Each structure stands twice: as structure tokens, then as C-alpha cells.
Amino acid sequence: MQAGGSGEANAAAIPAASNIEASATGGFGSSGIVDTARRYLGGGNPTGRSSLWCARFMNMVLQQTGHRGTGSDMASSFAKYGTRVSGPQVGAIAVMGRRGGGHVGIITGVDARGNPIMISGNSSHRVREAPVSRGQIYAYMMPTN
């Protein structure tokens, strides 16, 4: 089940495996949510929305794993969803601020430089896993419902 999308993302290409470190703290859903999101890697847009679909992708993954999601197509809606955690944890939702809008994805690990690795929809027009600058993320939220 893979598909394609339309664009957002300043994330770099996935680094070599030797540069990736697993997060020291696994979070709620670190297998279920991450595994579900990974099924869509490399594919296009599985959401049916023609643009700005990162939040729609996040809601879809949450619903497929038994969570309610926010029901919003706005990435910023996830800044009030679940329980805030202090830093990147596997399974946490990362909310990013960006000029002209925001972006949201699920944390899968931390790279050797300490940057979170995240799966997100609408990253270079597809579902992608890539490190992002930790300074771009303003909220880490653990799903609780």
C-alpha cells in the first residue's frame, strides 16, 4: 500500500544506516504507529487530498492504529493532541513550524547529530523518512487515545 503526494519538506535524504541511531526512549505506539507509517514509504499520496496532505496522512495512520486523530488538515492541530513530551521519542508526533504553514510526522529515531528522524506525508511529494533539524520542531506529542 504505497502512494504519492504534493510537496513540503526541507528534510535531507535518508542517511546511511551507520549514521542512524535508535532513540534511547521508545514511546507509546513505537511499533504500531511507526510500522503502519512505514508501509507507505516511497509511495505517493494515499490520502485522496490533492495538496497539503501531511496532517491528513498523520490522521490516517493514527486511525489505522486505533486512535482518533485530530480530524483537521492543519499540521498545527497536532500541537494540542495527546501528551507533550520533552524531546524526540520513537512513536511521538513531531509538529514543525515552517514559513507559510507547518508540517507533521512521526518520530522513528535520532541520527548521529541528534536530529530527529521522521516519517511524514507530503515530503517532496511522497511519504518519506528523513532526518529534520531539531530546531524546526516546536512540539513532540505522544498519542494517548
Region annotations inferred by a language model:
Residues S6, S18, S23, S30-S31, ...:
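Generic serine detector
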